[in-house]
């Protein structure tokens, strides 16, 4: 049955997709429901996946639906879902879906404006995964919170931008943040970063 459901997704006809929708509603099998979600993705049926992301009670299936929305670059649907969602766990999945879709703007909005500190920090880390280096540097400059600045440093390491981190290191006056930047630089395979660390170690006090 699972392979048959996936085949219907490949066919992609609206009439055919009614069958997987009915299977999803009727089935108690997580594997079968997962196959139906894959059929929806193969058929580019954003509406059906969004409905699952909104209403599914099984956390794993709901997370998979959100991930598939990201794979379909359904950024508007993810943004809408984020605004209406109250669960932190689900919101993390939505942010990860935005990362899969390469959606910088929505992640940046969450990094700037999300009142939940944990979610804000997650959005900052994911900005590094989508290569939003310039946005992270600017965010660092306007953010005074030490913990969030630490998340930005981590985001820049994820982005592999040692040069930007060196720039922040040279401007930073907080000893704890300077230490964090140095620790992250030491984990990077970056010649310029290694040279900067060596310079600081040999520099006279």
Model-inferred region functions:
Residues 59, 108, 117, 125-128, ...:
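Mature soluble domains of exported/periplasmic/lumenal proteins and thiol-rich metal-chelating peptides
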Residues 95-97, 122-126, 131, 135, ...:
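Eukaryotic tandem repeat interaction scaffolds
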Residues 29-31, 58-60, 87-89, 116-118, ...:
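Alpha-helix N-cap/helix-start positions at coil->helix boundaries
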């Amino acid at each position: 049955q699972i392979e048959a459901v996936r085949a219907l997704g490949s066919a992609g006809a609206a009439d055919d997709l009614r069958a997987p929708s009915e299977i999803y509603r009727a089935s108690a099998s997580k594997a079968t429901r997962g196959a139906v979600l894959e059929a929806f993705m193969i058929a580019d049926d954003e509406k059906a996946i969004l409905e699952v992301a909104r209403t599914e009670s099984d956390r794993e299936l709901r997370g998979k639906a959100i991930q598939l929305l990201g794979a379909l670059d359904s950024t508007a649907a993810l943004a809408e879902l984020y605004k209406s969602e109250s669960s932190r766990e689900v919101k993390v999945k939505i942010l990860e879906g935005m990362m899969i879709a390469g959606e910088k703007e929505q992640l940046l909005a969450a990094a700037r404006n999300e009142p939940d500190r944990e979610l804000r920090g997650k959005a900052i880390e994911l900005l590094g995964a989508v290569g939003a280096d310039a946005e992270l540097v600017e965010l660092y400059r306007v953010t005074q919170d030490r913990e969030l600045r630490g998340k930005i440093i981590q985001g820049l390491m994820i982005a592999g931008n040692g040069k930007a981190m060196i720039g922040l290191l040279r401007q930073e006056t907080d000893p704890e943040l300077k230490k964090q930047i140095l620790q992250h630089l030491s984990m990077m395979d970056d010649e310029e970063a290694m040279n900067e660390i060596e310079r600081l170690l040999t520099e006279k006090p």
